Structures are given as structure tokens and as C-alpha cells.
A protein has these predicted regions:
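Nucleotidyltransferase catalytic core that binds NTPs
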Residues: 1-241, 249, 253, 280
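A C-terminal functional module that forms or caps the active site or interfaces directly
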Residues: 232-284
Length: 284
């Protein structure tokens, strides 16, 4: 696997290494890679290996995007592990990993604000309501990344389901011929969704954070998920979670109206000073 300090040297390499432009399979990340990211890269590798005779190239980017953090402390405390990230990416099957700089991504300087994005409930509810401007930053950086990489396929995890839906809408609107490939959530043995933020939880806190997933499953299996979500949120609060939302909405549009077979449970809560999010499909 090759490592590049930015997209310009990576693109120069591609132009010299391939007689025919390869189909690019892209896994954008913010680093602090874990087994869930490994699943994304392995999914891209498997997809590439099934593409037949066309040349392919699996590339991972690692860039901590300052415009999508609504709290400075969250940004400054985000873990950085570049050497370990490169090893994991290589082991999972990446052909290249790119570490773009803030200057490359924002040559005019990091903007104090970015253009607002309005995709209805996709951007205005749940994370969009609790973290105003968050998806503006996500869309800005993903648009920037896609313009630089121009992948045929981009791989994103279902743990950040709402972000996945927003990015799918962005690609549909602005990038013809590009496809988003969802990858299922990887979980720890306890059921806790894998996240780089989990590193900030001590042993017992990390173990007990699994109550979040248990609450989701309880709601999803209920005969009345929307009513059960209220009780589950109260029970999480009694355990010490600071619940921001626990809601049942349509997984495609994020609208609240009940549609059998199309509902999903979403939760965001603080635990041990760390903000955790997760989601599962309703099971009936």
C-alpha cells in the first residue's frame, strides 16, 4: 500500500501508474480507524476484486474536518493515530491512503461558516436539529473530497445512518455516475456500535454504554415502538445517560409518519462525557 501526503501527489501517481484510468473505490474517514473502518475498506476491496478486467484502485482518505464539529473541545480531543491507521488500511486491502492537509482542503482558510444545506427532514431533524450546521460542514467536505477523488463508488457506514442518507442525496443531486455503497454497522461484543469516540470511555463506562444498544433493540422489537421509545429514553436517563433523542422515523426520509417495514430507531446520548449515536431497523 502507498501513502500520500495529499491528493495532488496521489493523482500524479495514478496518472503514471495506469494506462487506463482505474475505477476508484473511495473510503473517506476522519482517522482513528477501528474494525468498523476495516469493514468499509474490506467491502471496497471485495467490490474492486469483483469488477472483472477493468483496473480498480481502493483509496482511503484521513482528514479530520473542522467544519463539522459544533464544539471546539470535541474537535481538539478527536484522536489522531496516523501510523496505526495506515497499518489497518493496508491490512484491510487499501491500495493507497491519503492524508490531505487543512490547507489543501481549505486553501482560503477554514471557513467560519459554510453554505447551508436543506434536504428536508434529512438535514433538519435528529442530528440536524441537535447540531445546527453539522450537515452543512459534512456536505461541504464530502463535496470537496468527491471533486478531488472522483470515485466510481464511495463507501459509508450505516452507524451514521442520517449522514449516509444526506450524502446519498448529495451524490444523487451533484455527482452523476457516482454511487454510495452502505456498509453495516460493526459492533463490539457488548453490542456498542464501534466508534472512534469509544476510545474516550474507560473500561466500565465502555462496557455499560451497551445499554444504548439494548434500548434500541427493545424499541425495535416492541409492538408499539413509538410509545416504547419514550419509556426507553426515561430508563436510559435513570442509568445516567443524557438522552438527546430516541425516536422512531422512516429510514428513507426520516419523516415520523409510520410506514410498516420502513421504520428505524435512532438515538443520541451523552455517557461519561462522550456523545454516542446509534440506530437499528425496526424488526416487524
Amino acid at each position: 500500500m502507498l501513502s500520500f501526503s495529499g491528493f495532488e501527489p496521489w493523482r500524479t501517481y495514478l496518472n503514471g501508474a495506469f494506462m487506463q484510468a482505474p475505477d476508484i473505490l473511495f473510503v473517506p474517514t476522519m482517522g482513528a480507524l477501528h474494525a468498523g473502518h476495516g469493514d468499509l475498506i474490506r467491502a471496497a476491496r471485495k467490490w474492486a476484486d469483483g469488477c472483472g478486467v477493468r483496473p480498480t484502485h481502493v483509496v482511503v482518505s484521513i482528514f479530520i474536518n473542522p467544519t463539522q464539529f459544533d464544539e471546539e473541545s470535541d474537535f481538539s480531543s478527536y484522536p489522531t493515530t496516523p501510523e496505526e491507521d495506515a497499518v489497518l488500511a493496508a491490512d484491510a486491502g487499501a491500495d493507497a491512503v491519503v492524508f490531505p492537509s487543512v490547507i489543501e482542503m481549505y486553501p482560503q482558510g477554514v471557513p467560519s461558516s459554510v453554505d447551508p444545506v436543506h434536504y428536508g427532514a434529512l438535514t433538519d431533524t435528529l442530528e440536524g436539529a441537535k447540531r445546527p450546521g453539522h450537515f452543512d460542514g459534512v456536505v461541504a467536505v464530502v463535496r470537496n473530497l468527491m471533486e478531488k477523488v472522483r470515485p466510481r463508488w464511495a463507501f459509508f457506514g450505516e452507524k451514521d445512518w442520517q449522514q449516509l442518507a444526506v450524502i446519498q442525496r448529495l451524490i444523487e443531486f451533484e455527482f452523476e455516475g457516482m454511487e454510495v455503497v452502505p456498509v453495516p454497522t460493526r459492533r463490539e461484543q457488548s453490542g456498542l456500535a464501534m466508534s472512534s469516540r469509544n476510545q474516550r470511555l474507560s473500561g466500565s463506562l465502555r462496557r455499560d454504554a451497551a445499554a444504548l444498544y439494548a434500548a434500541l433493540i427493545r424499541v425495535a422489537k416492541s409492538t408499539d415502538p413509538q410509545a416504547e421509545s419514550l419509556q426507553a429514553a426515561a430508563d436510559l436517563e435513570s442509568l445516567g445517560f443524557e438522552v438527546e433523542y430516541l425516536e422512531v422515523v422512516q429510514e428513507g426520509s426520516l419523516e415520523p409518519e409510520w410506514v410498516p417495514g420502513e421504520m428505524r430507531v435512532f438515538v443520541a446520548a451523552r455517557w461519561g462525557g462522550v456523545r454516542l449515536i446509534d440506530n437499528v431497523s425496526c424488526l416487524q
